[in-house]
Amino acid sequence: MALLCFNSLPSLSSLSSSSSSRLLQSPSFASPVLSLKPNAVESKNRVSLSAYSLNSSHGRIVVKAAASGVDGAEPESKEEPKTVVAAVPVDKLPLESKEAKEKLLLELRLKMKLAKKIRLRRKRLVRKRKMRKKGRWPPSKMKKNKNV
């Protein structure tokens, strides 16, 4: 597996008149390959990455990733795994998916109800706090305040 990454904008060092005219005359992929020493990085999950610098003026890098097995050997086949997707009619899908969907909807409804209860309770408590601050709570106190 190889990945070619390049910067579409030329770097500041390549903006001189001779190099910019060379850039305009020849396509960017036709430039000669300058291979430097590879930088290999090995991670914990046995994937090694190696990078080679192709052309320093264009800033292109080829990155190769290879997954090694448990014993460190190369993978046996280099073919890409083929995924087989079969078209199944909706009528023939198992009923479990419908039951699972209904179960998720039920759980969602319960969560929404609980959230609504919490919101309403918080609103009630805020209203009570404001009324206490103004001296209008508890409601039995209102009868006493009428005579004043």
From Swiss-Prot:
Subcellular location: Plastid, Chloroplast
Transit peptide: 1-65
Statement: the UniProt record of this protein carries the keyword Nucleotide-binding: no
Modified residues (N-acetylalanine): A66
Annotated GO biological process: plastid translation; ribulose bisphosphate carboxylase complex assembly
Domain of life according to the entry: Eukaryota
Region Disordered, residue ranges: 125-148
Keywords recorded for this protein, A-Z: Acetylation, Chloroplast, Plastid, Ribonucleoprotein, Ribosomal protein, Transit peptide
GO CC annotations, alphabetized: chloroplast; chloroplast envelope; chloroplast thylakoid membrane; cytosol; ribonucleoprotein complex; ribosome; thylakoid
PANTHER family reported for this sequence: 50S RIBOSOMAL PROTEIN 5, CHLOROPLASTIC, LARGE RIBOSOMAL SUBUNIT PROTEIN CL37
Assembly mode: Part of the 50S ribosomal subunit.
Protein family membership: Belongs to the chloroplast-specific ribosomal protein cL37 family.
Record protein name field: Large ribosomal subunit protein cL37
Organism this protein belongs to: Arabidopsis thaliana
Gene: PSRP5
